[in-house]
Regions:
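Conserved "repeat-terminator" motif of extracellular CCP/Sushi domains
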Residues: 22-25, 108-126
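Short, ordered, surface-exposed loop/turn motifs in non-cytosolic proteins
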Residues: 28-30, 38-56, 80
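Hydrophobic beta-strand segments
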Residues: 46-51, 85, 124, 164, ...
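Short, acidic Ser/Thr/Gly-rich low-complexity loop/linker segments typical of extracellular
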Residues: 54-73
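Structured extracytoplasmic
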Residues: 117, 121, 128-299, 305-313, ...
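Exposed, low-structure sequence patches enriched in small/polar residues
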Residues: 406-940
Length: 940
């Protein structure tokens, strides 16, 4: 009996083995990487599929296919016996690879050859493009039109509300790190070798990681969105950089984008979306490639390329569910290398959607890849961002207080990492993140620790931080936050002006390391020409604790300032300090030399909310003393009666005034929704901040009292109201317009020192919001409207000019204008202006009454003052040169008369022995009507 059972068991085992052998047929597999055969760059999103033979259609694509990932890696296998493998991508020749049945190959490097009849030919030969591609009757165009028409139909945004959890990780790595480690210099960095990742095409070293966990809230009616970051962590080289604008610039580069919008905001530019409802089918050419399976869904692979590859668009693939919904399951997009885009050699996005239980489609995962370079596009920094969505909830009501703040994003003030702020253990992060870190990513802290033990590396970090923050730390450490007091701004140590000559300045500012709520900054300065010492001392108390400076995070503080220094009325100091060395480089035109010595005692309160609404209240006492060519002379008109004719007239008399005191209160309301700007140590918006898209609305009112009673005057009570609007307007891939409008009014009678004088620029550098050919204090007004507009073509015009497009220049045009007037009450040349200060005049005139030299100031006339400029940017990637021309007020009357002179320089007299008076005029010479200005701007 036992032998029978054993026999039966053997039969069953043999039969099972036969069945298993039949159920596990021979598997053919291959994995590797796809690269550009010319450059060696990896190729993401290449279509890869097995071919199969049919009886009636011959060799066709099989149902088994995949795409290379964002790094060009791929893996594919089949058990159906397919051995021919096809590699296909727009712009490259199709590659065919043959395997043996059952073969399993790994580490294969597939080189694809650029197709001269592919993407490049679409741009170069429009005749062929027109012949080969037609929109009318094209199934691909009809397909994309259906997708665009239904793109919002099954989107999660059609739900009444939702909540989702997000995990975001960004890594930075040094790419193509091929060096000779035996050389003397590189031997110092021999420890880096163990951190080199060789799994990619080129060896790379991960140097920085940032990750955060957050929640996203959405409500359809009324429309409200909110992102709340609950935890964040940064470690690596980035944690050593002291410029807050660096982190914000990175956030702006890798911001969330929506393909359903008409344009996509990437790399501080606007790219036309392949699903644009307005110009998609005219901007792109679409091709149906194949039908493949994507995560179990049969999808149509729709490839697309821009009509002009130098326009701001994408190449890529749309994977559209092959049913009546025309729903987008996945997309993979790349930026064409022909685009006039700097510092980026590769940029790709792969985005997946998933279907929720209620049938709506929601984001599932986004992977963004970028390679940045400075000098050599073969070496640079690799950046990768991965965002994963989980926990979609469309049912649970959202608490009302979630949307209590108007801002679309809440970020904790304190960083949640082991460096500063709340400590969260590495083990806790391991449990929180949905995907583990690789060994190379997890070892970043160890790498940085070894770097910071090197004096050479610490010196390099100190130099970079000094340039970007303009301050030198006083701690011998690579960590900027270790310093208690920093010295700077470094670009203000030495400067020059007409009054002081060479100006020497030394100062600094404290940090949160000294005290996290009390801050001090100040300086002392000395002029080699006027020999007067100047100073500034500012004490600030912040109501919230800060990590480094009082201008990180939301601003809420009160300040006390004592200052004695030189001021130049009408000088543009919006972006840089007046004594910045670059602002003191003069142009060839003569400067006016109008200066004041001013003592300030000032207190200020500032409060900023998450929604970027802020209020500022300031009280300032000042004592003003004229200097240089500037003088204060009170004009008093007295009535004169002719004893013969009994005619009356008003004759002016001038009373010199040495100084006056001023008491002024200021209230400012500012709203800039979506503004990510960071502020430097002086409280100015950082010049390194590249994202300028947010609008700004600012309403300011001044009320004050000018006290000159000690000079025999009556004093002046005044009110001034001013409104400013600033916004960047994008025109998709066709550039953008930067617009600033400012208007204001002075309500009471005030001397010229309190009138509005347009902001002027006397340096060789272009002032975006100032007048570049107007002289300092040339015009004065009490009612005014100013316009500053600059249009950046972003290369779309020059790209269409053969030959010139090879230079990769970008055109820029602009206009600056001011229109206003001076009412009678504030015109010292009229008797109604009695008691005012005379406009400063130190000019000399020729025999015909024309201005020759010196200084003069006058009310503006009936015409607006207009300047235009045109030029090119992207010269060596960061230089911009503009030709500037003065359009109006090139020959105009001054509001007074001057004696007519003979050839000997003596006044000419009439029959009564009185000087002959002629109308004074000012004619701007040719060199003063035209100018060339330079500016430095990263043309991204």
């Amino acid at each position: 009996m036992r032998q029978i059972k054993l026999y039966i068991s053997c039969i069953v085992l043999c039969f099972a083995g036969m069945v298993m052998a039949q159920e596990e047929p021979t598997r053919t597999s291959i994995s590797g990487i796809v690269v550009d055969g010319d450059t060696g760059e990896t190729l993401p999103f290449v279509q890869i599929y097995f071919l199969k033979s049919t009886s009636n259609k011959g060799v066709v694509a099989s149902e088994i296919g995949t795409t290379s990932d964002i790094d060009g890696n791929f893996s594919i296998s089949n058990t159906q016996g397919y051995t021919s493998l096809n590699f296909q991508m727009v712009g490259f020749k199709t590659e065919l690879l043959t395997l043996r049945k059952g073969q399993q190959r790994k580490g294969v490097r597939v080189k694809m050859t650029p197709d001269v009849y592919g993407l490049q030919d679409i741009v170069v030969t429009p005749k062929n493009r027109k012949r080969d591609y037609k929109r009318k009757g094209n199934p691909a165009v009809e397909l994309i039109q259906n997708v665009i028409a239904r793109k919002d139909s099954f989107c999660v945004h059609t739900a009444d509300q939702y909540t989702a959890q997000t995990y975001n990780r960004m890594s930075f790595a040094l790419d193509n790190l091929k060096v000779n480690w035996d050389k003397r210099f590189w031997k110092k960095f021999d420890f880096v070798r163990k951190y080199i990742d060789t799994t990619g095409v080129y060896p790379s070293v991960t140097i920085s990681i940032r990750e955060n966990i957050g929640e996203e809230y959405y409500q359809r009616k009324p429309h409200r969105e909110k992102k709340i970051m609950t935890k964040k962590r940064t470690f690596g080289i980035e944690d050593l950089i002291g410029s807050g604008s660096f982190q914000e610039n990175v956030n702006a580069i890798f911001r969330d984008v929506e393909i359903n919008d008409n344009s996509m905001n990437l790399l501080f530019n606007r790219f036309v979306s392949p699903l644009s409802s307005t110009i998609a089918t005219t901007f792109y050419q679409y091709y149906i490639m194949d039908t493949i399976m994507v995560d179990g869904y049969p999808c149509i692979d729709l490839a697309f390329v821009p009509v002009n590859s130098q326009s701001y668009g994408f190449t890529g693939h749309l994977y559209i569910v092959n049913d009546s919904t025309f729903r987008l399951k996945k997309y993979a997009i790349n930026i064409p290398p022909e685009i006039n885009l700097n510092f980026v050699s590769n940029f790709s996005i792969e985005h997946d959607y998933k279907q929720l239980d209620n049938g709506l489609w929601a984001p599932d995962r986004t992977t963004t890849y970028a390679k940045f370079y400075i000098f050599d596009n073969k070496r640079g920094i690799l950046a990768r961002q991965t965002k994963i969505y989980t926990g979609w909830d469309l049912e649970t009501p959202i608490a009302k207080e979630t949307f209590s703040s108007l801002t679309a994003e809440d970020i904790p003030t304190l960083a949640s990492d082991s460096t500063h702020g709340e400590y969260i253990s590495i083990q806790e992060w391991d449990n929180l993140r949905p995907e583990p870190l690789s060994w190379y990513e997890a070892s970043v802290q160890d790498l940085v620790h070894e770097f910071t033990s090197m004096p050479l590396f610490n010196s390099l970090v100190l130099f970079v931080n000094s340039v970007t923050t303009e301050y030198i730390t006083t701690e011998h450490s690579s960590h900027y936050w270790d310093s208690k007091f920093d010295i700077g701004p470094i670009f203000s140590f030495v400067s020059w002006n007409m009054l002081e000559g060479v100006r020497l300045r030394f100062g600094g500012a404290s940090t949160a390391k000294l005290h996290d709520q009390f801050y001090f900054r100040g300086y002392v300065a000395f002029g080699t020409k006027d020999l007067r010492p100047k100073y500034n001392a500012t004490l600030m108390y912040t109501f919230d604790k800060h990590e480094w400076t009082p201008y990180t995070g939301l601003r809420h503080h009160i300040t006390l300032t004592g200052q004695y220094d030189v001021e130049q009325p009408g000088l543009n100091t919006e972006m840089v300090e007046r004594d910045n060395i670059f602002a003191s480089i003069p142009t060839s035109k003569p400067t006016m030399g109008f200066y004041q010595y001013v003592f300030h005692a000032r207190t200020e309160y500032l409060k900023e909310w998450q929604n970027k609404l802020s209020i500022r209240a300031r009280f300032d006492f000042s004592n003003n003393e004229a200097a240089g060519a500037l003088s204060y002379n009170r004009v008093d008109y007295k009535m004169n009666v002719d004893p013969v004719t009994m005619d009356t007239s008003f004759l002016p008399s001038l009373t010199p005034i040495r100084s006056f005191r001023n008491y002024e209160g200021q209230f400012e309301l500012r709203y800039s929704p979506g503004n990510r700007a960071t502020f430097d140590r002086m409280g100015k918006e950082s010049t390194y901040m590249l994202d300028k898209d947010a609008p700004t609305f600012k309403l300011t009112h001044y009320v004050g009292y000018l006290d000159d009673r000690h000079n025999g005057g009556d004093g002046f009570v005044y009110n001034r109201t001013e409104f400013l609007f600033d916004k960047r307007f994008w025109f998709s891939a066709f550039g953008h317009l930067d617009l600033r409008l400012q208007t204001g009014m002075i309500w009471q009678k005030v001397p010229f020192t309190h009138l509005y004088m347009p902001s002027t620029n006397t340096s060789i550098f272009l002032a975006k919001h100032g007048f570049n050919l107007m002289h300092s204090m040339e015009f004065a007004m009490d009612e005014y409207v100013t316009l500053n507009a600059t249009y950046y073509f972003k290369g779309w015009l020059i790209n269409r000019i053969p030959g010139l497009n090879k230079l990769k220049l970008r055109g820029v045009v602009g206009v600056s204008a001011v229109y206003g007037g001076l009412t009678k009450k504030n015109n010292p040349f009229l008797e109604t202006g009695s008691g005012l200060y005379d406009f400063p005049q130190t000019a000399t005139f020729d025999n015909n009454g024309y201005y020759v030299a010196g200084s003069t100031s006058s009310p503006i006339g009936k015409l607006p003052y207009i300047e235009i400029n045109a030029g090119f940017e992207n010269i060596l990637k960061f230089i911009r040169i503009d030709y500037v021309r003065r359009i109006t007020y090139n020959d105009y009357e001054l509001p007074f008369k001057v004696p007519q002179m003979d050839n000997a320089g003596n006044p000419m007299l009439d029959e009564n022995g009185e000087p002959i008076m002629i109308q004074a005029r000012r004619r701007i010479p040719a060199w003063g009507r035209n100018g060339v200005k330079i500016s430095f701007r990263l043309a991204l």
